A protein has these predicted regions:
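Amphipathic helical "hinge" segments at domain boundaries
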Residues: 45, 53, 60-123, 133, ...
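Hydrophobic alpha-helical segments within soluble ligand-binding/sensing domains
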Residues: 171-197, 237-245, 301-319
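Flexible loop/hinge segments that line or gate small-molecule binding clefts
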Residues: 137-177, 181, 199-202, 286-297
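N-terminal helix-turn-helix DNA-binding module of bacterial transcription factors
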Residues: 1-75, 343
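Short beta-strand segments enriched in small/hydrophobic residues
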Residues: 32-35, 72-85, 193-201
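An alpha-beta-alpha
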Residues: 182-229, 323-340
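Structural motif
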Residues: 108-128, 230-249
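Flexible loop/turn connectors
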Residues: 249-343
């Protein structure tokens, strides 16, 4: 392969690197370069690598408009992201960043839609051929967007699981298994009186899928193990009241599962004022553990893996026939110093 020392070529035009320049540098035809960029035909790995190396060496940037006309694609996907008062934005942004990162690896950009646009937002981007597909977050059990997604001729993936999953492609953490894993962990340690401090009341009122599934797993596992269990919705500003209520109504409580990252700190502070601190009060968390606090037993929220899976599934649907189904990632519980056998 001959060296090209400059982005400027003597073809009588300006100095912009063109697809013909990449083809000449890589020793292939311009159509082969196009196929590598579009993925429309199978190209050998060695040729694909040579073309990619030439693209990088020359600094070639495909023209988005021309590429879209040629492939009938926008090379953009939409992400419907929840931005509302009861959503913990740092967690939502972890999913968003993972989707953007994975999309760029597939040569796609991401158009953000807010939850408030609802079904009309989906119709707008589909009707205007603005995107090649859409990923929807914060899915409710009876989500108004689901019938629209079924009706639109637009590939889609849900990060979350509604009640009716027919003809849908969904991916998420198995939150029911996560709730159950925490119960079994505490029961194995000998706890018989536990509580789940969950999401804000509004999350349950609108029947958000991940929250409902966590409660289901929690309650079924508690019944299976013969453990006394209760649910308390919570938000950071009600955490003290929730702690005081549990201490008053459940004096025998020895285990706590927290599915609400912003409330972890206020809850631990409130219990500590009454002399209840881990591991005397065993505490496990579902989701990210706030920095700076005690090391908590927890089930991690694999936002990066979920986002990457969602993008991969969407690209499969964009490139070929749909294969609907539900993918649930197995929860991984890490035991730390915050849980122990009751005294």
């Amino acid at each position: 392969v001959r060296n090209i020392s400059s982005n400027r070529f003597d073809d009588g035009r300006d100095g912009t690197v063109r697809i013909s320049d990449v083809a000449r540098h890589a020793g292939v035809s311009p159509s082969t370069v196009s196929y590598v960029l579009s993925g429309k035909r199978s190209i050998s790995e060695s040729t694909r690598r040579r073309v990619r190396e030439s693209i990088e060496a020359l600094g070639y940037q495909p023209h988005a408009g021309a590429r879209s006309l040629a492939s009938r694609r926008s090379n953009v996907i939409a992400l419907v992201i929840p931005l509302r008062e009861d959503v913990h934005v740092p967690v939502a942004m972890r999913f968003a960043v993972s989707v953007v990162t994975a999309a760029r690896a597939h040569d796609h950009d991401v158009l953000l839609l807010t939850q408030g646009e609802g079904p009309d937002g989906l119709r707008r981007v589909a009707g205007g051929a603005m995107v090649d597909g859409v990923i929807v977050m914060d899915v409710e059990a009876d989500d108004a967007r689901v019938p629209v997604l079924r009706a639109l001729d637009l590939p889609s993936v849900l990060i979350g699981v509604p009640e009716d999953t027919e003809d849908l492609t969904c991916v998420d953490l198995d939150f029911a298994a996560a709730g159950a894993a925490c119960v079994h962990h505490l029961a194995d340690l000998g706890h018989t009186d536990i509580a789940l401090v969950g999401q804000p009341p509004s999350v349950y009122e609108r029947r958000t899928g991940f929250a409902e599934r966590t409660v289901t797993g929690f309650e079924l596992a508690a019944a299976e193990r013969g453990v006394r269990a209760t649910l308390r919705p919570c938000s950071p500003d009600t955490a003290r009241g929730v702690a005081e209520e549990l201490l008053r109504e459940r004096p025998g409580l020895t285990g706590l599962i927290v599915h609400n990252e912003p409330s972890v700190g206020p809850l631990l502070d409130a219990f500590a004022e009454y002399g209840r601190t881990p591991p005397e009060l065993s505490v496990a968390a579902i989701g990210p553990v706030p920095p700076g606090g005690p090391p908590l037993t927890s089930v991690d929220l694999p936002a990066e893996e979920v986002g990457a899976r969602a993008v991969g599934l969407l690209m499969d649907k964009i490139d070929g026939p749909a294969h609907p189904g539900v993918t649930l990632l197995e929860p991984r519980l890490t035991s730390r110093e915050s849980t122990a056998s009751p005294a």
